[in-house]
Amino acid sequence: AKGRKGSIVAVVKGTRSEDVVAHFRKIPQKLRKQVKEITLDMSGSMKLIARTCFYNAAQTVDRFHVQKLALEALQEIRIKHRWKAIDKENEIIAEAKKKGEKPEFEVFENGDSLKQLLARGRYLLYKSRENWTQSQKERAKILFGKYPDLQKAYQLTDELRKIYNQKIIKSVALLKLAHWFK
């Protein structure tokens, strides 16, 4: 883009703020003051670099990192429930062993045990519901019926994904994000 609007100024290897700042300081301050916006990840070093070198520029967090953070939070909820299910299953096994019986686990209509449901549910949580297979739809119905907090977290993550996937002007996007945040 030869320095025009929307062009990439530099791609710098590494995230050590001292190295990156030294690299950007090679660009004259007059030119760095003209930069209006910087896209960066959520790391503290990137924010420091942006503040130090491009103090007039607005900082925009890369959508990939925002969505990644939301998905990680969603998976954390699933994993928390999975550990509880594993503990419960281990208790059932220990109790059955004491009694000399075969352990009996709850099996859902799709054939999954609770532990399997939470393990296999991992992949559907990464996808938009429009892209689920029939078995993923069935699994989601059971999973969300059993864990309403997981359903709420999935809905929030999916709504965020949809906002980012729309081709809309900035003011509309900000409004949608504000509604999503409530």
Q: Across the structure, where does each feature detected by a protein language model lie?
A:
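Acidic/histidine-rich catalytic cores and adjacent linkers
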Residues: 2-5, 21-26, 30-56, 64, ...
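Glycine-rich phosphate-binding "P-loop"
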Residues: 3-18
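Flexible, active-site-adjacent loop/turn segments at secondary-structure boundaries
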Residues: 10, 62-64
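Short, surface-exposed amphipathic charged segments that create phosphate/polyanion-binding patches used
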Residues: 71-83
